């Protein structure tokens, strides 16, 4: 029979998965919005759901820390969850920023580079895999997410080059800047997915890549 502590950890996993799913949804919606889909309000609503979920998970983590006083790997897991939800909340904010930009992109009838859509797909996958790595305690998977960030960065650099060429030809400078900022927000979402994966790695090993956050050693 599961202990109360084990049930709380399971609830934490469920809540993290739910918040991760909301992040996946809001990224996909933002990609649709820049292509003219009427989903801007849904993006803002989902961002609010993410904010609410962050507060709920914070409260759960604080209850676990105060009442259960976990040690070693369990403590790292709860501590990592607190850091992860901060990055997930930022993903929602940046998707909302993309939604704001989409209004101007649509108004100017600008064709959106396919690479921006590819960036959205990559970041959705990275968020999914980083959350899976947390729940499954899969060190290999979280390191894959960290490595995959290079693909998002490469795509962003290609978008910059493509937009520079289009602006040199006949693309309106304001429209080009809006598209560039959209790609930049997607690139930042990828960075947040990496941050999530790095905190998963910390939860599993006790060592953060920045070597600033070490707690409980490298043993479970």
Predicted segments with their positions:
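Cytosolic, long alpha-helical scaffolding segments
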Residues: 1-220
